[in-house]
């Protein structure tokens, strides 16, 4: 039979457009992604419900599987059905509808009367092919023909995968990172399943199966038990050994399967995180001598024995001399004259009189001038909360030691301002330790000084082991730099400098303005 003659090209608005039907390409629709759960009759009824005159449902195999051609009476009906069917979600599938192209006209129905005949012929031909060639391997039935795996899937084979856990997901991630092809295929699969792309920020962790699974106690170790029956005699030894081997193998298989099932249900244990061992460094005598006492940890300063007890005065060898004058009677006369005057003076003060009458009187120690000076200097401080100047001087290293250390080689104090920069801090240092040292330069009774006092200790990143301390004024900052620079805190000497301030360069701006 010859194919149908193509229609005459006519203008849309010319005469005869209403009587002549439009070309078949304009009224035949190709419907893709039909659900596999529907039968051919149900698919045909579905498309006829939307106004199709003739429907041809293709087979579920091949290039055009799960597709159908639907021919409508006119172009308007085809357009209306396309708008209603396109992107329609049906049983979890999204339909894709488009006008049939010229290359697909071979598969499209020729007339309404031939649809059922061709459908029956196709079904009979396919059934004959399946009956005649059941063992022939085709590319469509193969697992992965591109990789050489052309054998079909076993229909009886069913996989029972365990639920996802943290260890399984970690192993999958490791496989993704090590096999680039696997990574690309996973991205393709996510794209086909309309999952969100993994290129953005980290998404929230979904609830895992292991979070809701009850914990099982581990199996106790099985202790070896003696055999219940004694060994048989030598004659039946071969038979008994064979029977016992069969029985033991069956029992071992059962026990092994039971243990595997119990272990599969057990929640995986988290691997123990071993703490890195800290290697103790050998301390030098120089560092051990300069280690400060535990005063930085306590609120009250440590009192030295010299602060509590009187220091013994060094008594030198005194020479005793006697000057005996020759005019003894005259001296006695003078003493007798002075005695009544002394008695009158002593009568006014009774305490002194008692002292003069009884022995030598009270002996008081000499006042220690150094202690009074230190008390007057530290009177402005709060020794119970902050470090004293004496402890600062004791904990500092000498200038000779500063020259030997690499931290102080290129030391410069910087431009004076109210903020100081502290570096070379130990990792155990906390903000309260810095407050214990630099709080002595702040008057906490003043609200302004209390607000200006600020400590920022860097504990992470490349600024680790450094701190910025804000003091009320430049005078306090200069005093803190002078007294605290080189103080050994937790075995490391502090390096104290003035912080760099971002001041505007007035000279350069004025030169530009000029």
Swiss-Prot record:
Cross-referenced PROSITE patterns: RRM
Coiled-coil region list:
none
Regions of compositional bias (Basic and acidic residues) in chain numbering:
115-133
Q: Which domain of life is it from?
A: Eukaryota
Residues annotated as region Disordered?
1-26, 106-133, 213-282, 337-363
Q: Which UniProt keywords apply?
A: Nucleus, Phosphoprotein, Repeat, RNA-binding
Name the cystine pairs.
none
**Where mainly located?**
nucleus
Extract one GO molecular function annotation from the record. RNA binding
Q: What InterPro entries does the record tag this protein with? A: Nucleotide-bd_a/b_plait_sf (IPR012677), RBD_domain_sf (IPR035979), RBM40_RRM1 (IPR034147), RBM41/RNPC3 (IPR045164), RRM_dom (IPR000504)
Check the record and name the Pfam families matching this protein. RRM_1 (PF00076)
Instruction: Name all RRM domain ranges.
Output: 27-102, 418-501
Q: Which residues carry this modification: Phosphoserine?
A: 21, 108, 349
Localization per Swiss-Prot or TrEMBL:
Nucleus
Q: Where is the composition biased (Pro residues)?
A: 217-230
Any one annotated GO CC term: nucleoplasm
Q: What does this protein do?
A: Participates in pre-mRNA U12-dependent splicing, performed by the minor spliceosome which removes U12-type introns. U12-type introns comprises less than 1% of all non-coding sequences. Binds to the 3'-stem-loop of m(7)G-capped U12 snRNA.
The record's note on quaternary structure and interaction partners says: Component of the U11/U12 snRNPs that are part of the U12-type spliceosome. Found in a complex with m(7)G-capped U12 snRNA. Interacts with PDCD7.
In Swiss-Prot or TrEMBL terms, this protein is called: RNA-binding region-containing protein 3
List the source organism: Mus musculus
């Amino acid at each position: 039979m010859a194919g149908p003659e193509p229609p005459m090209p006519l203008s849309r608005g010319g005469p005869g457009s209403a009587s002549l039907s439009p070309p078949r390409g304009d009224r035949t629709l190709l419907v893709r992604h039909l659900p596999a759960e529907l039968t051919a009759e149900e698919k045909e009824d579905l498309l006829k419900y939307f106004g199709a005159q003739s429907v041809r449902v293709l087979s579920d195999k091949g290039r055009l599987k799960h597709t159908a051609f639907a021919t409508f009476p006119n172009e308007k009906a085809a357009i209306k059905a396309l708008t209603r069917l396109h992107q329609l979600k049906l049983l979890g599938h999204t339909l894709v509808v488009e006008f049939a192209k010229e290359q697909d006209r071979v598969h499209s129905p020729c007339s309404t009367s031939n649809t059922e005949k061709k459908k029956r012929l196709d079904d009979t031909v396919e059934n004959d092919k399946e009956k005649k060639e059941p063992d022939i391997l085709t590319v469509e039935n193969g697992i992965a023909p591109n990789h050489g795996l052309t054998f079909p899937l076993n229909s009886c084979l069913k996989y029972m995968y365990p639920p996802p856990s943290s260890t399984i997901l970690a192993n999958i991630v490791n496989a993704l990172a090590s096999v680039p092809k696997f990574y690309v295929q996973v991205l393709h699969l996510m794209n086909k399943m309309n999952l969100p792309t993994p290129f953005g920020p980290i998404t929230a962790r979904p609830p895992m199966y292991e979070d809701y699974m009850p914990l099982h106690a581990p199996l106790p170790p099985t202790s070896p038990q003696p055999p219940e029956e004694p060994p048989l005699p030598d004659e039946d030894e071969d038979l008994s050994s064979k029977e016992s081997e069969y029985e033991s193998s069956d029992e071992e298989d059962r026990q092994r399967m039971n243990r595997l099932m119990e272990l599969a249900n057990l929640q995986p244990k988290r691997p123990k995180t071993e703490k890195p061992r800290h290697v103790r460094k050998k301390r030098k005598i120089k560092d051990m001598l300069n280690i400060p006492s535990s005063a930085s940890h306590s609120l009250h300063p440590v009192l030295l024995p010299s602060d509590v007890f009187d220091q013994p005065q060094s008594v030198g060898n005194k020479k005793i001399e006697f000057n005996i004058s020759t005019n003894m009677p005259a001296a006695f006369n003078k003493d007798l004259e002075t005695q009544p005057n002394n008695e009158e003076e002593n009568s006014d003060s009774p305490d002194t009189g008692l002292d003069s009458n009884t022995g030598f009187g009270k002996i008081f120690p000499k006042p220690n001038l150094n202690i009074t000076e230190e008390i007057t200097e530290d009177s402005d401080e709060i020794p119970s909360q902050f470090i004293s100047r004496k402890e600062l001087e004791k904990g500092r290293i000498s200038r000779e030691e500063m020259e030997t250390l690499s931290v102080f080689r290129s030391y410069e104090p910087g431009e004076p301002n109210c903020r100081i920069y502290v570096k070379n801090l130990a990792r155990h240092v906390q903000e309260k330790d810095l407050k214990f040292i630099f709080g002595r330069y702040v008057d906490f009774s003043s609200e302004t000084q209390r607000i200006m006092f600020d400590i920022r200790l860097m504990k992470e990143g490349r600024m680790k082991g450094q701190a910025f301390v804000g003091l009320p004024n430049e005078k306090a900052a200069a005093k803190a730099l002078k007294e605290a620079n080189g103080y050994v805190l937790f075995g490391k000497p502090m390096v104290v400098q003035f912080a760099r301030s971002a001041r505007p360069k007035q000279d350069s701006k004025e030169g530009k303005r000029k």
